[in-house]
From Swiss-Prot:
Family recorded in the similarity comment: Belongs to the CRISPR-associated exonuclease Cas4 family.
Protein's job: CRISPR (clustered regularly interspaced short palindromic repeat) is an adaptive immune system that provides protection against mobile genetic elements (viruses, transposable elements and conjugative plasmids). CRISPR clusters contain sequences complementary to antecedent mobile elements and target invading nucleic acids. CRISPR clusters are transcribed and processed into CRISPR RNA (crRNA). This protein is a 5' to 3' partially processive exonuclease that cleaves off single mononucleotides. Has a marked preference for ssDNA, although in vitro it also acts on dsDNA and ssRNA.
Outcome recorded upon mutating residue 113 to A: Impairs exonuclease activity
Residues annotated as binding Mn(2+): 62, 99, 113-114
Keywords: 4Fe-4S, Antiviral defense, DNA-binding, Exonuclease, Hydrolase, Iron, Iron-sulfur, Manganese, Metal-binding, Nuclease
Gene name in the database record: cas4
Cofactors required: Mg(2+); Mn(2+); Cu(2+); [4Fe-4S] cluster
Protein name: CRISPR-associated exonuclease Cas4
Effect of residue 148 to A: Nearly abolishes exonuclease activity
Cofactor note: Mg(2+) or Mn(2+) required for ssDNA cleavage activity. Can also utilise Cu(2+).
Length: 202
């Protein structure tokens, strides 16, 4: 009963996700460009990851902490916004959804990004930090907090430097042109599309 509900809900969320034309999501900018492309071209492989227990656990922890932030810090949760950039003479939308946004006493936004991880080694991870920095740019915010929940600890890291627009344009170019695939050497090890990818690192 509960298992069926969780799996069905996860699949419905995945299938309802339709990418708009000339739109790049923040998460696309911090992962392998080929993986982003393959998720659209090989949907059957992408769907298989929907049922991973670790993904469902992450969703549940997100919902729980977002509820705590909403109830105790007056946070807005699942806040979406977008900004436009010019890449090669063409306008693209950079779209993102922050886990939560808290207003401080001065009315300024603090962007909260929640991450779950099996390990607490090497935190904060560079791609997570970059993601939050892009959110700071996207929401015109000066402060962000990266919250990690792992089996061994709960930790938060303050990020106060938005990514500059020139870097975001370069990341978007990589995503569009399939350059710098993968972005990080470790990505292939965990990628469902590695079985068909010519850029796989051995």
């Amino acid at each position: 009963m509960i298992t069926e509900f969780l799996l069905k809900k996860k699949l419905e969320e995945h299938l309802s996700h339709v990418k708009e034309e000339n739109t790049i999501y923040v998460t696309d900018l911090v992962r392998c460009p080929r993986r982003v492309r393959y998720e659209s071209e090989y949907k059957e492989l992408a769907i298989s990851q929907v049922y991973a227990p670790s993904a469902i656990l992450g969703d549940i922890l997100h919902l729980g902490l977002e509820s705590v932030l909403k109830g105790n810090f007056n946070a807005e949760t699942e806040v979406e916004t977008l900004r436009e950039i010019n890449v090669g003479g063409k306008v693209y939308k950079i779209k993102g959804r922050a886990d939560a946004i808290i207003r401080n006493d001065n009315g300024k936004s603090i962007v909260i990004e929640i991450k779950t991880s099996r390990s607490d080694k090497g935190l904060p991870l560079i791609h997570h930090k970059m993601q939050l920095q892009i959110y700071l740019w996207l929401f015109s915010a000066e402060k962000g907090i990266l919250v990690y929940i792992t089996p061994d600890r709960i930790a938060e890291y303050e990020i106060n430097e938005p990514l500059d627009e020139a870097t975001i344009v370069r990341l978007a170019e990589d995503t569009i042109m399939l350059q710098n695939s993968p972005r990080f050497n470790w990505e292939c090890k965990y990628c469902i599309f590695s079985v068909i990818c010519p850029a796989k690192l051995t």
